[in-house]
Amino acid sequence: MNAPGGRRKEGRRTHRPREQDRNVQLSKALSYALRHGALKLGLPMRADGFVPLQALLQLPQFHSFSIEDVQLVVNTNEKQRFTLQPGEPSTGLLIRANQGHSLQVPELELTPLETPQALPLTLVHGTFWKHWPSILLKGLSRQGRTHIHLASGLPGDPGVISGIRPNCEVAVFIDGPLALTDGIPFFCSANGVILTPGNAEGFLLPKYFKEALQLRPTRKPLSLAGDKETETQSGPKLSSRGGRRKIQQ
């Protein structure tokens, strides 16, 4: 519809996308502060990972957010990344990340999974093509975090809340009972993510891989064979600039 003078009149814009962007911004800021940056930011983190929410909101990057904003993100986060709980009168509300820490959190609420029967029937790690050759040769690494993250199913499976990204390209299925037999510990976080520190070097070795599955663009089994075959499993070929064919490594 044209407004007088020939200018086009736009319809009313909804504020919902802006609100969603704001919630994503807050969720990312919370994830960094509570998983990785608490010490750098001067936050008083307890041994169980909780920090006073009021102390968090006093940081410059949180000045535009309120307690209600945080409560909304905590309550609506699909992966249930955070927990809020009442604290002492002197501290008020407390908040923590349920998993994903690079910080040492010695008393994080984790349930030990000490027998094969305690483990989920499916243990799977999601990754991307660029990491697959290295994973197939060396195993899964916890890298800078305290644990390797596993899920009890693939993205979209019933009951799978967190532990695997929906855009993962490769799924690696783990033989949990075999790893337990070798002394590899497993835990379950408050939001259902299965966690393991791996071996002494922080790896879950390829000997514990049961199978692997390409998830994108279509699902199909992947070989767990050695070096030469690994080179052919670098994902779908993509056209690069100038018309050359390029394989993601």
Curated annotation (Swiss-Prot):
GO BP: tRNA splicing, via endonucleolytic cleavage and ligation
Enzyme class: transferase
Coiled-coil region: none
EC code(s) of this entry: 2.7.1.160
Keywords per UniProt: Acetylation, NAD, Transferase, tRNA processing
Modified residues (N-acetylmethionine): 1
InterPro entries assigned: Ptrans_KptA/Tpt1, RNA_2'-PTrans_C, RNA_2'-PTrans_N
Chemical reaction(s) catalysed: 2'-phospho-[ligated tRNA] + NAD(+) = mature tRNA + ADP-alpha-D-ribose 1'',2''-cyclic phosphate + nicotinamide
GO MF term list: tRNA 2'-phosphotransferase activity
UniProt-annotated stretches for the region Disordered: 1-25, 220-249
Record-linked Pfam families: PTS_2-RNA (PF01885)
Protein origin, superkingdom: Eukaryota
Family from the record: Belongs to the KptA/TPT1 family.
Function summary: Catalyzes the last step of tRNA splicing, the transfer of the splice junction 2'-phosphate from ligated tRNA to NAD to produce ADP-ribose 1''-2'' cyclic phosphate.
Record-given protein name: tRNA 2'-phosphotransferase 1
